[in-house]
Structure formats: C-alpha cells, structure tokens
Amino acid sequence: APSEPHHPGDQATPDQLAQYYSDLYQYITFITRPRF
C-alpha cells in the first residue's frame, strides 16, 4: 500500500503543494476503495 504523503510545509512551492494533493488523493482513493 502507498504510504501517506507528508505535507511539504508552510514554505512549499505551488508545485510541491500540487504534487502533495495529487499524492494524497491517490492515497485516499487507494485506502478507501472496496477490497473485492
């Protein structure tokens, strides 16, 4: 399973934040999808 992404912090660039939210979305989708 993917590990939970870490927030890049208050000094993060927009690109870093975009990558973080992309990774977070994929992580949440993975852990919440049915396991059938």
UniProtKB/Swiss-Prot annotation:
Q: Which residues carry this modification: Phenylalanine amide?
A: F36
> Which key words tag this protein in UniProt?
Amidation, Hormone, Secreted
Q: Which GO terms describe its cellular component?
A: extracellular space
Single GO MF descriptor: neuropeptide Y receptor binding
Main location, first listed in the record: secreted
Q: Which CDD domains match?
A: PAH
* GO BP terms: feeding behavior; neuropeptide signaling pathway
As for what it does, the entry says: Hormone secreted by pancreatic cells that acts as a regulator of pancreatic and gastrointestinal functions.
Family the entry assigns: Belongs to the NPY family.
Under which name does UniProt file this protein? Pancreatic polypeptide
Q: Report the gene name.
A: ppy
